[in-house]
């Protein structure tokens, strides 16, 4: 068995449930990336990208199953979320590197602030439109069932929170909490 095959097939059983090593490793890499980010270390970017790439394969389980019977579902919102985070991380890595080279030590790349009323008036309709389009896209790709709306919110909320982070909006933390309030029960179901 190759290392790649092992990575894609290995699981830990918890009673009648199982979790893939990819999901565990991807989650641990995400946590490691967050710690590196708090310490302002450049390693946050490649570690986070690697973790998101692994999690991308988890949520497109039917595509990356290598014939395993237990991975017949794709969660396009979750997979899209990880793809979005990969692209944003690449952008962040480039911006971080540019900012570090600009010769302005000690100055933040983004200054945190609350959104203005005008920004909220643009963001709220944009979120509704984004959610509606993502919902229709995931539905057209064959995603069905009760989790279609949940998966779409996870993707939409992640896009919104990530955009908010890039702009320095303080409210993005509230959006991350809302994503987690939906996403954590989703992960355990």
Annotate each language-model stretch with its function.
Residues 53-56, 86:
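A short structural micro-motif
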Residues 1-46, 50, 57, 67-70, ...:
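Polytopic alpha-helical membrane-helix bundles and their juxtamembrane interface segments
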Residues 67-93:
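Individual alpha-helical transmembrane segments in multi-pass integral membrane proteins
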